[in-house]
Design a protein with these regions (language model features):
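Acidic, polar-rich N-terminal leader regions of halophilic archaeal proteins
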Residues: 1-214
Length: 214
């Protein structure tokens, strides 16, 4: 069951990472660009708060899909909408101070930015392992299809010698290829599980609740 959760965790990484990256860059660029007006700073603060919410969501994914105990950012754990964060008033300044001084607020920014790179890596790993494994496992069913070529094309060595090509075109070769596919599937699943565990633990380490602010 955990393997399926890890695969789902990896599959979600790229689309989520892309959305996070675009949202953070847009919010930061808009806020910095409008700093000369009164609206720029609130946009930056809202972006920073949104990043902590995203990090809290990532902590939940790490717990429920990655199987790692990850804490939400400090500010999010202490957040109380009645404390005056949404509208200036009692506790508003203190809430802003807690937001910008909590270490996990800024590690949340690191996490959100790193998610895009991890998502890209996860996408490549899933695509390559899935396509290669699928091709080998399907060999006994497609080896004699004239529209399908299963094998490795020839490679030129030192400009004079050609190695290959190696093509699966007989049933015994197809059976061997399917066995290779089973072995590759086992190896790929272990590597993908390790990749998912690494990211879940990385998330948990970044979001460790700090006892004091910056």
């Amino acid at each position: 069951v955990q393997t399926y959760k890890n695969l789902l965790y990896l599959a979600l990484a790229f689309p989520l990472g892309l959305v996070y990256f675009v949202g953070l860059v847009f919010g930061a660029a808009l806020g910095v660009g409008l700093l000369i007006t009164w609206i720029g700073l609130p946009i930056l603060l809202m972006t920073l708060f949104a990043v902590t919410v995203v990090a809290g969501f990532e902590a939940a994914l790490a717990r429920y899909l990655g199987g790692v105990n990850a804490s939400v950012p400090t500010f999010l754990a202490e957040f109380d909408i009645s404390g005056g964060l949404v509208f200036p008033g009692n506790g508003f300044v203190d809430a802003i101070k807690r937001l910008v001084t909590a270490r996990t607020t800024w590690t949340s920014v690191v996490l959100v930015l790193a998610k895009f790179g991890f998502g890209l890596l996860s996408f490549v790993a899933l695509a390559v392992s899935g396509s290669v494994t699928g091709a080998f496992l399907a060999a006994p069913f497609i080896y004699d299809d004239p529209d399908v070529v299963l094998g490795i094309s020839g490679m030129v060595v030192d400009g004079d010698y050609t190695v290959g090509p190696w093509v699966v075109d007989t049933f015994p070769e197809a059976l061997v290829a399917s066995v290779v596919g089973v072995v590759f599937l086992f190896v790929a699943l272990n590597l993908l599980n390790s990749l998912a565990r690494f990211h879940a633990r990385y998330t948990a380490n970044l979001l460790q609740v700090d006892d004091e602010g910056l």
